[in-house]
From Swiss-Prot:
Organismal lineage: Bacteria, Bacillati, Actinomycetota, Actinomycetes, Bifidobacteriales
Protein name, entry field: GTPase Der
Entries under CDD domains matching the protein: EngA1, EngA2
Domain EngA-type G: 27-190, 202-375
Described function: GTPase that plays an essential role in the late steps of ribosome biogenesis.
Cited SMART domains: AAA
Length: 463
C-alpha cells in the first residue's frame, strides 16, 4: 500500500463528513450581549465567512443558530444568541430567557459589549445572570477599531469579569487574542466536565423529542442508586451527569439535567433542545433513542435518530408506553418498522413501559449487545476470506464492459466499525449495501452503524 492508502485506513483520507462521525468532544462557546453590539459580526469573523445575519437594527438575530468552528486546531461549536432587551421585563423577557438557556448549555461564554456606547444597565444585568450561571466568561469590548480607542475598554473593568479584551469584529482586530483566551476557557471547562468519564463506565445518552418519557425512564432505571458525578458551581441546576446502577452494572448517563429540566416550555426551546441533544450524542458512546409508541412517529423523532446514526454511535431504539398499545396500534408500528426505520433495521429494539417498569429489564442486554458490536473487530484474514466468498456468490454488475472486483479489505477502526475496501473500480451503492448486509448476517454488528469506504486501485498485471 502507498501513502495514500495508509492515510485512508488511518482516517486521514476520509471525507469531512466521515471524520465528523468519529467520537470527539466538542465544546460549546456562546456569544451573548445586548442588541447591536456586534455579536453576529464577531461570529462571522470567527467562522471566516458571512454565516450570521448582520444589520444595524437592534434585535435582528431572532433565530438562535449554532455553527461548527475551528481555531488553532481545536474544534468547537459556536452559538450566536439573540440580544438582551433592556425593557420593563428586563432579565425575565422572552429573549433573555432564550439566551439564558444558551448560557446554561454552553461550556464557556464570550460576553460582547459596545466600547463606543460604554457600559449600560443592560450590560450589568447580563453580568448578574452570567455570575449565577457560573460559566467561564471572556469579556470582549467591540468597536475598538484602532489604538487610539483602546482607552474606552478600561471602563469595563468595573463589571468585575476580569480583563476586557479590545476587539473590532468588523476589521478583525484583536479577535485572534480573544479566541486564544476563550479556547483556554473551553479546555479548562472540559477538564472538569462530564467529558472526563469515571474509569470503565460506558457513556449513555437518553435522547428523544419532548414528552416521550425520558425523565420517567431515567427515574425507573435509577431508582435510588444514583451518584452525582458533576455539579455546576454556583447554580441550582440538576447534576450534569449521573452514575446509574442497572441490574448491578454502573452506567454514566450524560446530561441528565437536560432530561429533567422542562426546557421545551421555554420560548425557543425547540432549538435549544436540539442543540442539547446533539451535544449529548457527541459525548456519548451509546444513544438510547426514546419514542412514544402511543403517538405517530414524527419528523423530529427521525431527526434525533439520524443524528445518532450519522455521529457513528451505538444505538438502542426504545418504544415507550408499549403496554398501553392495542393490537391495531402494534401492527401499525410494525408496518412502520419496515418503512420509516429501514435505515436502522440493524438496531437493537426494546418495547417497554417507563411508568410501570414493564420490560425495562431487557434494556441492559440490548445496551451491552450494541456496545459489544460497536467495539467489534474482524481479523483481516477472516474478513478477506468472507468477502471473497460473497463476491464469488454475487459478483458486482458490469460497468462499462468491466467488472469491478474487490482486491483487499481491512477494518481500519472500531467505534463504529469502519472498513476500507480496495477495488479495481467503483462499487455501486447497491453493492455496498449488499456487502454491509452480508457483514451483519455473518458477524452480527447489531446496534451499531457500519462505515464502508472504497479506494479504487487498478489490479496489477503480471509480468
Amino acid at each position: 500500500m502507498d501513502e495514500g492508502d495508509e492515510d485512508l485506513i488511518s482516517g486521514r483520507g476520509f471525507t469531512e463528513g466521515a471524520r465528523k462521525a468519529g467520537p470527539k468532544p466538542v465544546g460549546v462557546l456562546a456569544v451573548v450581549g445586548r442588541p447591536n453590539v456586534g455579536k453576529s459580526s464577531l461570529v462571522n469573523r470567527i467562522l471566516g465567512r458571512r454565516a450570521a445575519v448582520v444589520e444595524d437594527t437592534p434585535g435582528v438575530t431572532r433565530d438562535r443558530v449554532s455553527y461548527d468552528a475551528e481555531w488553532a486546531g481545536t474544534d468547537f461549536k459556536l452559538v450566536d444568541t439573540g440580544g438582551w432587551e433592556a425593557d420593563v421585563e428586563g432579565i425575565e423577557s422572552a429573549i433573555a430567557s432564550q439566551a439564558q438557556v444558551a448560557v446554561t448549555l454552553a461550556d464557556a461564554v464570550v460576553f460582547v459589549v459596545d466600547g463606543q456606547v460604554g457600559m449600560t444597565t443592560t450590560d450589568e444585568r447580563i453580568v448578574k445572570m452570567l455570575r449565577a450561571a457560573g460559566k467561564p466568561v471572556v469579556l470582549a469590548v467591540n468597536k475598538i477599531d484602532d489604538q487610539a480607542s483602546e482607552y474606552l475598554a478600561a471602563e469595563f473593568w468595573k463589571l468585575g469579569l476580569g480583563e476586557p479584551y479590545s476587539i473590532s469584529a468588523m476589521h478583525g482586530r484583536g479577535v485572534g487574542d480573544l479566541l486564544d483566551v476563550a479556547l483556554d476557557k473551553l479546555k479548562q471547562a472540559e477538564k472538569t466536565s462530564g467529558y472526563l468519564t469515571p474509569s470503565g463506565l460506558r457513556r449513555v445518552a437518553l435522547v428523544g423529542r419532548p414528552n416521550v418519557g425520558k425523565s420517567s425512564l431515567l427515574n425507573q432505571l435509577a431508582r435510588e442508586e444514583r451518584a452525582v458525578v458533576n455539579d455546576l458551581a454556583g447554580t441550582t441546576r440538576d447534576p450534569v451527569d449521573e452514575i446509574v446502577n442497572i441490574d448491578g452494572e454502573d452506567w454514566l448517563f450524560i446530561d441528565t439535567a437536560g432530561i429533567k429540566r422542562r426546557q421545551h416550555k421555554l420560548t425557543g426551546a425547540e432549538y435549544y433542545s436540539s442543540l442539547r441533544t446533539q451535544a449529548a450524542i457527541e459525548r456519548c458512546e451509546l444513544a438510547l433513542i426514546l419514542f412514544d409508541a402511543s403517538q405517530p412517529v414524527s419528523d423530529q423523532d427521525l431527526k434525533v435518530m439520524s443524528t445518532a446514526v450519522d455521529a457513528g454511535r451505538a444505538i438502542v431504539l426504545v418504544f415507550n408506553k408499549w403496554d398501553a398499545m392495542d393490537e391495531f396500534d402494534k401492527q401499525r408500528l410494525e408496518r412502520l418498522w419496515n418503512t420509516e426505520f429501514d435505515r436502522v433495521m440493524w438496531a437493537e429494539r426494546v418495547n417497554l413501559s417507563a411508568k410501570t417498569g414493564w420490560h425495562t429489564n431487557r434494556l441492559t442486554r440490548a445496551m451491552d449487545k450494541a456496545l459489544e458490536s460497536w467495539d467489534q473487530r474482524i481479523p483481516t484474514g477472516k474478513l478477506n476470506a468472507f468477502l471473497g466468498k460473497i463476491q464469488a456468490a454475487h459478483p458486482h454488475p458490469l460497468r462499462g464492459g468491466k467488472q469491478p472486483r474487490i482486491l483487499f479489505a481491512t477494518q481500519a477502526s472500531t467505534r463504529p466499525p469502519r472498513f476500507v475496501i480496495f477495488a479495481t473500480g467503483f462499487l455501486e451503492h447497491g453493492y455496498r449495501r449488499y456487502i454491509e448486509r452480508s457483514l451483519r448476517e455473518e458477524f452480527g454488528f447489531e446496534g451499531t452503524p457500519i462505515q464502508i469506504s472504497v479506494n479504487i486501485r487498478e489490479k496489477k498485471k503480471r509480468k
